[in-house]
């Protein structure tokens, strides 16, 4: 039962990444090592973020929820956008190729670093626990989030982006950066359960994805 549970969690977490890699056409461009380079950039950015947070923001321990402090901590996630832009700027090719390489490499590195060990240790335990299923589903939400963020960074860095689209792209980028902070605050204030919080995050990410897709299509069509 424990091995079967681990297999289910592993498949739910990792197979969507493999399917995305195969179906997006990246395998035809031999982009595997480009994705690995994106993953290495992710590790460097996360190290810088950890050092910055540990230096300037003390850990919140109980008591009143520190909204200002948590907001400032969430602002550090801007570094992810800078890292994604760095990855895309080092890759030549079409926009969708750059977006998928950066997003898939970034999300895969996060998956390996933050969820691989918990799944291996926890999902193989004696007792069944839904939190590992939730963790696997959350990894798929993260993949969508990074694809959305990469598309937003690609659009905002276009030198020929129409000025009428720039405010909309900046707004979506702001929402992407502070989405985790807003969701965490909402869950804290409303005392939501784990499944409800996961559903809320999926809905918010889906809305951002649809909005970004509509804007991306508009930008591409204008410049085609």
UniProtKB/Swiss-Prot annotation:
Keywords assigned by UniProt, alphabetized: Cell membrane, Endoplasmic reticulum, Membrane, Nucleus, Transmembrane, Transmembrane helix
Tissue-specific expression: Expressed in T-cells, B-cells and monocytes.
GO biological process terms on file: multi-pass transmembrane protein insertion into ER membrane; protein localization to nuclear inner membrane; regulation of apoptotic process; regulation of cytokine production; regulation of mononuclear cell proliferation; regulation of nitric oxide biosynthetic process; regulation of phagocytosis
UniProt key word Nucleus: yes
Quaternary assembly: Component of the back of Sec61 (BOS) complex, composed of NCLN/Nicalin, NOMO (NOMO1, NOMO2 or NOMO3) and TMEM147. The BOS complex is part of the multi-pass translocon (MPT) complex, composed of three subcomplexes, the GEL complex (composed of RAB5IF/OPTI and TMCO1), the BOS complex (composed of NCLN/Nicalin, NOMO and TMEM147) and the PAT complex (composed of WDR83OS/Asterix and CCDC47). The MPT complex associates with the SEC61 complex. Interacts with CHRM3, CHRM1 and AVPR2. Interacts with LBR; promoting LBR localization to the nucleus inner membrane. Interacts with DHCR7. (Microbial infection) Interacts with H.contortus GAL-1 (via domain galectin 2).
Family: Belongs to the TMEM147 family.
Annotated membrane topology: Multi-pass membrane protein
Name under which the protein is recorded: BOS complex subunit TMEM147
Superkingdom of the source species: Eukaryota
Record's function text: Component of the multi-pass translocon (MPT) complex that mediates insertion of multi-pass membrane proteins into the lipid bilayer of membranes. The MPT complex takes over after the SEC61 complex: following membrane insertion of the first few transmembrane segments of proteins by the SEC61 complex, the MPT complex occludes the lateral gate of the SEC61 complex to promote insertion of subsequent transmembrane regions. Also acts as a negative regulator of CHRM3 function, most likely by interfering with its trafficking to the cell membrane.
Principal location listed in the UniProt entry: endoplasmic reticulum
Cell compartment(s), UniProt: Endoplasmic reticulum membrane; Nucleus membrane; Cell membrane
Cytoplasmic side: 22-34, 89-98, 156-164, 217-224
Lumenal side: 59-66, 125-129, 188-194
GO molecular function: ribosome binding
């Amino acid at each position: 039962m424990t091995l079967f549970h681990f297999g289910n969690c592993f498949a739910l977490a990792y197979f969507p990444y493999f399917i995305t890699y195969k179906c997006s056409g990246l395998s035809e461009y031999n982009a595997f090592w480009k994705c690995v380079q994106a993953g290495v950039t992710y590790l460097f950015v996360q190290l810088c973020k950890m050092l910055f947070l540990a230096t300037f923001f003390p850990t919140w321990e109980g008591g009143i929820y520190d909204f200002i402090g948590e907001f400032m901590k969430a602002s550090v996630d801007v570094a992810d956008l800078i890292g994604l832009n760095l990855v895309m700027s080092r890759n030549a090719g079409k926009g969708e190729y750059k977006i998928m390489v950066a997003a898939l490499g970034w999300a895969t590195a996060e998956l390996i670093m933050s969820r691989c060990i918990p799944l291996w240790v926890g999902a193989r335990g004696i007792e069944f626990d839904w939190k590992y299923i939730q963790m696997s589903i959350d990894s798929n939400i993260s993949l969508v989030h990074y694809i959305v963020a990469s598309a937003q960074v690609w659009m905002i860095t276009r030198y020929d982006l129409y000025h009428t689209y720039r405010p909309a792209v900046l707004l979506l980028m702001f929402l992407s950066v502070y989405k985790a902070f807003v969701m965490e605050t909402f869950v804290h204030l409303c005392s939501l359960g784990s499944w409800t919080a996961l559903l809320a995050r999926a809905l918010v990410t889906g809305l951002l994805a649809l909005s970004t897709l509509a804007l991306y299509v508009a930008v591409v069509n204008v410049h085609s």
